[in-house]
Amino acid sequence: MRILLAEDDELLGSGIRAGLAQHGFQVDWVRDGVAAERELATGAYQAAVLDLGLPRQDGMEVLRQTRARRNTTPVLVLTARDAVPARIEGLDAGADDYLIKPIDLHELAA
């Protein structure tokens, strides 16, 4: 399964990428929202892990634009914001799930 990881934190991104690779996933990693939106538009991914706090274009806008193009790739939103309004906003924008940092790699891989 090919997964797009959009995360600007180098340490966290490398950990997520390595953890998913250990579970047999092919992971392409981008570090900003513009690149994430461009990659999602290709339709090449079976899932995406999208940080909301991306530079150049925030993850929420990437998600909205992706869904506006009727792209149905499952998207897991990743953020440090553990607030109910943020969760509702992400799910309303089309996220399939909402994960709070720090994450459990076994939970993510499932």
Q: What do these predicted regions represent?
A:
Residues M1-A110:
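N-terminal/domain-start alpha-helical segments
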